[in-house]
């Protein structure tokens, strides 16, 4: 089960004090703490592929 609700709500709490918005970590030291992508986007190793963009973190907004 994916603990991240980002794909449904746009935000999630990834455990402890770590919170994410739009699959980007906002309150911990990691660049990303959710292995999820926005609705309609594909997941890949380094981020999300949205709107035909290449696979990198800038795709997941």
Swiss-Prot record:
Annotated GO biological processes are: protein complex oligomerization; response to cadmium ion; response to copper ion; response to mercury ion; response to zinc ion
Q: Which domain of life is it from?
A: Eukaryota
Binding of a divalent metal cation 3: at which residues? 14, 18, 23, 28
Q: Name the keywords, alphabetized.
A: Metal-binding, Metal-thiolate cluster
Binding of a divalent metal cation 4 occurs at: 33-34, 44, 48
Region Alpha: start and end of each range? 29-61
Q: Which GO terms describe its molecular function?
A: cadmium ion binding; zinc ion binding
Which InterPro entries does this entry report, sorted A to Z? Metalthion_dom_sf, Metalthion_dom_sf_vert, Metalthion_vert, Metalthion_vert_metal_BS
Question: Region (Beta) spans which residues?
Answer: 1-28
Q: Does the keyword Metal-binding apply?
A: yes
* Function recorded in the entry: Metallothioneins have a high content of cysteine residues that bind various heavy metals.
This protein's name: Metallothionein A
Please tell me the species this chain comes from: Salmo salar
Give the taxonomic lineage as stored in the record. Eukaryota, Metazoa, Chordata, Craniata, Vertebrata
